[in-house]
């Protein structure tokens, strides 16, 4: 070992925080060490040629996907207060405006329930997809129940006996009378 090499070695033992960058082989971190072929350019301490994956970005993406899936699942429940306000403003009279409101209140949940498989495809990446799907289904069923309630309060549902008179056969006459004569 040469005198300069032993000095570098001793210096490395005493001061572990010091890195000797000068010298032919004593701690030099040039491209020649990594196979680049150029010994004069130096890499900084801790530099890696390969890209290090950032786990915080992956974690953030997973959290955003979960948040988006919950937004989709809670969408029908968020519409219920607005539907209640529209029901109140439309009134209980049978006219074109309240009838259109009731039709739209019933059609939107039916349409969402028919397209539930497409919605579940968006929820597949979530870890809580069963619970989110259940919340989505309950929200749409509640919207449909509100529409049925509004139809009942407007009198559009056949809930009385008089609503079914068209389907009842008229009673048969047991006898016919004409004045005071028997026929």
Curated annotation (Swiss-Prot):
Q: Which UniProt keywords apply?
A: Acetylation, Apoptosis, Endoplasmic reticulum, Membrane, Transmembrane, Transmembrane helix
Question: Entry's InterPro entries?
Answer: TMEM85/Emc4 (IPR009445)
Outline which residue ranges sit on the Lumenal face.
88-98, 149-183
Main localization category: endoplasmic reticulum
Q: Which Pfam family, just one, is annotated for this protein?
A: EMC4
Any one GO MF annotation of this record? membrane insertase activity
Quaternary structure and interacting proteins, as annotated: Component of the ER membrane protein complex (EMC).
> Which protein are we looking at?
ER membrane protein complex subunit 4
């Amino acid at each position: 070992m040469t005198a300069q090499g032993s000095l570098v070695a001793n210096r490395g033992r005493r001061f572990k925080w010091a890195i000797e960058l000068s010298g032919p082989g004593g701690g030099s971190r040039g491209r020649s060490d990594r196979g680049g072929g150029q010994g004069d350019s130096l890499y900084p301490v801790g530099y890696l040629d390969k890209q290090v994956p950032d786990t915080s970005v992956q974690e953030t993406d997973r959290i955003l996907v979960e948040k988006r899936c919950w937004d989709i699942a809670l969408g029908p429940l968020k519409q219920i207060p607005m539907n209640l306000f529209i029901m109140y403003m439309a009134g209980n009279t049978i006219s074109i405006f309240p009838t259109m409101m009731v039709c739209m209140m019933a059609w939107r949940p039916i349409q969402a329930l028919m397209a539930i498989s497409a919605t579940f495809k968006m929820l597949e990446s979530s870890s809580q997809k069963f619970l989110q799907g259940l919340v989505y289904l309950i929200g749409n069923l509640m919207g449909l129940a509100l529409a049925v309630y509004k139809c009942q309060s407007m009198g559009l549902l056949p809930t009385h006996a008089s609503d079914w008179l068209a389907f009842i056969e008229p009673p048969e006459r047991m006898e016919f009378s004409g004045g005071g004569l028997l026929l």
